[in-house]
């Protein structure tokens, strides 16, 4: 074992073992441990450990081990505890070494499972882990922006007036832009966490793409086109790739840079290398990719119209079932960044609406099946609000046929949205009725029409073709 690993184990022993630790974090020089019972800490033993420079008693036990060393010690303590830094430790064993072995075995099984699923599914999980924590912010900022847009329209129409209303609109827009304008920074932070890099460095790389402080007189040139590089060019695709590369460089530097200068040298060199690559290489190239992707998808929706809408609406539910729908998250965000709205999301939302229609048909058609109806009582209300997993995994998928007819209903609703055209959403996250406040360009009626048609399509196809005699007459959730 390395001296840092030995130091980590001695610290764990002195603070009362893994069972007495709630979580672990670290700063530049200290490992900060939140303990469950302070009486179990042997402070004299802790201070006498070789490598411990000092101990500070606070709301956390702060063990000073020095710059550079602290990252390695905290990391090994995290591995032994079985919990990532900052997260609550699950106490499975009184012997932390046995706990570590059990965690290692669990990690091995998880790794083997990932290998079986393939790299593509691992990529989807990574995308989900980066963006799912941001969804509440998207929803909140999007709804506040929607309220600001409604108030602005009412002001322009003369239906309301007053300086306070104008100020309120300004404040709401500032709150909305607090999320959308700095999305690259949030993405960089979350990507760094996912890739095992320092979150702050990921945020800096995200902020670098905003080209803060540049004016028309001191623009940076795109080396591929000769034109000025635009703030945010390359979007989140470029940020994610840059932070992934940053994580590789930072980890390697931690291994080779001496502990005494690690805290200074590693972040400086990492940002220097990745910052230059981001500005001159990643932003221009990712800009080509993201611009092309958004153009192609919008073109497919515009040109395909009804047909494209049906295909997206019909096949989105199986993508959700397989977890593949997460691959659309960066696409939605890029569409919002470039055009102000994602025209893909309202069509995809029809998949959930078709499932709601199918569930309503099952409620009517299978009156004798009390088990099914009890399940629907809990799953159907949230289905209207766009939370479809209870219906997918609790009702339609186990029954088989209703899942297929729900997909058909979603396809019909998607065809309506595609046929009407230009129905977009200004933020991601909600679906179903919950998406209504986020619909752009006053296309609310078009979206409602799509929902109603999807409900009806799912209901009709399920009522006539989506049930069996066993479903209708049995008292179990099965066909």
Curated annotation (Swiss-Prot):
User: Matching Gene3D superfamilies, A to Z?
Assistant: Glucose permease domain IIB
What the entry lists under Pfam families is as follows: PTS_EIIB, PTS_EIIC
Identify the residues that the record assigns to the PTS EIIB type-1 domain, covering every copy: 5-87
- EC no. given is 2.7.1.-
> What are the recorded GO MF terms, alphabetically?
kinase activity; protein-N(PI)-phosphohistidine-sugar phosphotransferase activity; protein-phosphocysteine-N-acetylmuramate phosphotransferase system transporter activity
Keywords of the record: Cell membrane, Kinase, Membrane, Phosphotransferase system, Sugar transport, Transferase, Transmembrane, Transmembrane helix, Transport
Q: Which residues form the PTS EIIC type-1 domain?
A: 125-479
Biological process GO terms, please?
A: peptidoglycan turnover; phosphoenolpyruvate-dependent sugar phosphotransferase system
Q: Where are the transmembrane segments?
A: 130-150, 169-189, 195-215, 229-249, 269-289, 303-323, 344-364, 379-399, 403-423, 445-465
- Keyword Magnesium carried by entry: no
Annotated localization: Cell membrane
The cellular component terms of Gene Ontology attached to this UniProt record, alphabetical and capped at eight, are: plasma membrane
Q: Which SUPFAM superfamilies match?
A: Glucose permease domain IIB
In what way does this protein cross or attach to the membrane?
Multi-pass membrane protein
Q: Give the protein's biological function.
A: The phosphoenolpyruvate-dependent sugar phosphotransferase system (sugar PTS), a major carbohydrate active transport system, catalyzes the phosphorylation of incoming sugar substrates concomitantly with their translocation across the cell membrane. This system is involved in the uptake and phosphorylation of MurNAc-GlcNAc, the principle peptidoglycan turnover product of S.aureus, yielding cytoplasmic MurNAc 6P-GlcNAc.
How does the entry describe the domains? Answer: The EIIB domain is phosphorylated by phospho-EIIA on a cysteinyl or histidyl residue, depending on the transported sugar. Then, it transfers the phosphoryl group to the sugar substrate concomitantly with the sugar uptake processed by the EIIC domain. The EIIC domain forms the PTS system translocation channel and contains the specific substrate-binding site.
Query: What is the recorded name of this protein?
Result: PTS system MurNAc-GlcNAc-specific EIIBC component
């Amino acid at each position: 074992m390395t001296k840092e690993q030995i130091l980590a184990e001695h610290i764990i022993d002195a603070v009362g073992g893994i069972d007495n630790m709630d979580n672990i974090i670290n700063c530049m020089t200290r490992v900060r441990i939140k303990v469950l019972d302070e009486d179990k800490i042997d402070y004299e033993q802790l201070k006498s450990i070789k490598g411990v420079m000092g101990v500070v008693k606070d709301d956390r036990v702060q063990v000073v081990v020095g710059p550079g060393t602290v990252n390695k010690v905290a990391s090994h303590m995290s591995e032994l505890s079985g919990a990532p830094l900052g997260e609550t430790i699950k106490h499975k064993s009184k012997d932390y070494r046995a706990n570590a072995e059990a965690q290692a075995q669990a990690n091995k099984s998880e790794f083997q499972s990932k290998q079986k699923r393939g790299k593509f599914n691992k990529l989807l999980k990574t995308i989900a882990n980066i963006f799912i924590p941001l969804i509440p912010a998207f929803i909140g900022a999007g709804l506040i922006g929607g309220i600001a847009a409604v108030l602005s329209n009412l002001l322009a129409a003369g239906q309301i007036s007053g300086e306070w209303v104008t100020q309120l609109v300004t404040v709401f827009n500032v709150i909305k832009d607090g999320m959308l304008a700095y999305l690259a920074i949030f993405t960089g932070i979350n990507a760094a966490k996912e890739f095992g890099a320092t979150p702050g460095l990921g945020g800096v790389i995200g902020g670098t793409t905003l080209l803060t402080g540049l004016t028309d007189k001191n623009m940076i040139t795109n080396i591929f086109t000769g034109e000025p590089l635009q703030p945010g060019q390359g979007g989140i695709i470029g940020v994610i790739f840059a932070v992934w590369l940053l994580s590789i460089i930072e980890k390697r530097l931690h291994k080779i840079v001496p502990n005494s200068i690690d805290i200074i040298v590693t972040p400086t060199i990492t940002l220097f290398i990745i910052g230059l690559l981001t500005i001159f290489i990643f932003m221009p190239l990712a800009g080509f990719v993201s611009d092309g992707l958004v153009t192609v998808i919008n073109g497919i929706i515009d040109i395909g119209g009804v047909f494209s809408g049906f295909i997206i609406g019909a096949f989105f539910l199986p993508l959700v079932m397989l977890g593949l729908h997460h691959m659309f998250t960066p696409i939605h965000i890029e569409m919002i960044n470039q055009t102000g709205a994602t025209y893909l999301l309202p069509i995809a939302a029809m998949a959930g609406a078709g499932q709601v229609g199918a569930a309503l048909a099952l409620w009517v058609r299978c009156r004798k099946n009390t088990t099914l109806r009890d399940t629907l009582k809990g799953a159907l209300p949230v289905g209207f609000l766009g939370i479809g997993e209870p219906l997918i995994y609790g009702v339609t998928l186990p029954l088989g046929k209703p899942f297929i007819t729900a997909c058909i209903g979603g396809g019909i609703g998607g065809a309506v949205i595609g046929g009407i055209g230009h129905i977009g959403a200004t933020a991601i996250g909600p679906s179903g009725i919950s998406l209504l406040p986020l619909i752009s360009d006053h296309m609310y009626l078009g979206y409602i029409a799509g929902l109603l048609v999807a409900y009806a399509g799912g209901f009709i196809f399920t009522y006539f073709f989506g049930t069996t005699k066993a479903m209708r007459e049995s008292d179990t959730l099965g066909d």
